Amino acid sequence: MFNINPLENLKLYISSRPPLVVFMISVSAMAIAFLTLGYFFKIKEIKSPEMAEDWNTFLLRFNDLDLCVSENETLKHLTNDTAAPESTVTSGQARTSTQSPQPLEDAGPVNISVAITLTLDPLKPFGGYSRNVTHLYSTILGHQIGLSGREAQEEINITFTLPTSWSSDDCALHGHCEQVVFTACMTLTAHPGVFPVTVQPPHCVPDTYSNATLWYKIFTTARDANTKYAQDYNPFWCYKGAIGKVYHALNPKLTVIVPDDDRSLINLHLMHTSYFLFVMVITMFCYAVIKGRPSKLRQSNPEFCPEKVALADA
């Protein structure tokens, strides 16, 4: 009669074949890992590795900039130069143009306006401006926000349009100039190659963003994080001025994610791989339960001697 003792066979299999047991445990862990990873790809939106930079990462680069609004800076009264130059086109015009796209070398600068949070932190000696300031202007190079290659030497003109005017009246009201926070319209003017080619953030209209009829523009200087922490850093860089900081909140709609079809395909491959590994482990487990200890014992075992067994039985 064929008698199977599963528990005893399993114990004998574990004691006689430790390497195979370790292999089974490793394969089981790998199968569970593939199964978990496949489920993760199924329910989670994964950022596409093919797109190195989107508008979220691009706008976050400006968070490391410090803008100095100097008290000695000359106010420029702007009344007739608000229109963009003929060589400059807005992003909306670039999208609606029916002409064939120009080569990258011949393309003119592009204007893109996005809403951004701007904080102005006046230092103690700063007394504010008697005029109503509604626009801040600065020019930086691409390497100041971490761009590399040809874009590192490209100029980027930045114009902040404030929703309300900023003057010394607020300073007189509080006895000193306090930090102010604006949701400003930031207009970036640069070569098209500087900007990401992904989905753009919602645009704002600078001309209608400020309710001031007569406005003044302040030219500001900018420094990046490398300059700020360099050995030759000037502690009086923005003496008697206000330091401006830009903050961009992450917008999930701007992140380029892996398409649903690709995620489903990845999940399918991982599931098939995990099923195959599970079948392998189950097959080895069934073999251990049925077969147990190998029938042929090692001849090198000194305790095993057929002659001694025969004499003992006699």
Swiss-Prot record:
Record carries keyword Membrane: yes
Domain of life the protein comes from: Eukaryota
A Pfam family it matches: TMEM219
Region (Disordered): 79-107
Record field: transmembrane: 21-41, 179-199, 236-258, 270-290
Keyword Transit peptide found: no
Protein family: Belongs to the TMEM248 family.
Full protein name: Transmembrane protein 248
Source taxonomy: Eukaryota, Metazoa, Chordata, Craniata, Vertebrata
Gene, per the UniProt record: TMEM248
